[in-house]
A protein has these predicted regions:
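Non-heme di-metal
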Residues: 1-191
Length: 191
């Protein structure tokens, strides 16, 4: 690979690293807020996504060659809001990454002869697009009162003990372990 020092791609990698690192922290804060509001699954999804953002940051960081580098970039300077507000803010950030920032960074990397880095920006965009969709779907569920209630009978799983309940609404208290509704999620059989 050609020398990265002094290229626009080097700055883009550091910008992406900083953005992913900050997103990771924001998502851990958002996870705490969701848990406090009674959305355990959404809290866990924020935490899972934070871990994925850490891996994106690590991938970008490993391309860098050391030294000092000054970048100028804009980052969200928001607050920790309600779960709904946090989901919407997270989705907006993810959309910006997959639809604008990373495609632009990939193009620049390829123009500068860094095809592998360009490909990595494109592949991480795929993950960011899925993060965006998941956050928007979860926000719609929160906004429409559909986190613990569905339009038809489905299976709900207690995330604490594994008890399965069938109905259009998750039970208020798990009859097996006595944990509140906050610990229920739609049963996924995706194995």
């Amino acid at each position: 690979m050609a020398n990265l020092k002094g290229t626009k791609t080097e700055k883009n990698l550091l910008t992406a690293f900083a953005g992913e690192s900050q997103a990771r922290n924001r998502y851990t804060y958002f996870a705490s807020a969701a848990k406090k509001e009674g959305y355990v699954q959404i809290s866990d999804i924020f935490t899972e996504t934070a871990d994925q953002e850490k891996e994106h940051a690590k991938r970008f960081f490993k391309f860098l060659e050391g030294g000092e580098l000054e970048i100028t970039a804009a980052f969200p300077a928001g607050v920790i809001g309600s779960t709904l507000e946090n989901l919407k803010a997270a989705a907006e950030g993810e959309e910006f990454e997959w639809s604008k920032m990373y495609p632009g960074f990939a193009k620049t990397a390829r123009e500068e002869g860094f095809d592998v880095i360009g490909k990595v920006f494109e592949m991480i965009s795929v993950a960011e697009k899925q993060h965006d969709k998941r956050y928007r779907d979860l926000a719609a569920n929160v906004q429409n009162g559909r986190v613990f209630k569905k339009d038809k009978k489905i299976k709900w799983r207690c995330r604490n003990c594994g008890y399965v309940h069938e109905g259009d609404t998750a039970v208020d208290l798990c009859p097996a372990c006595d944990h509140p509704q906050a610990h229920f999620e739609v049963l996924a059989e995706n194995w």
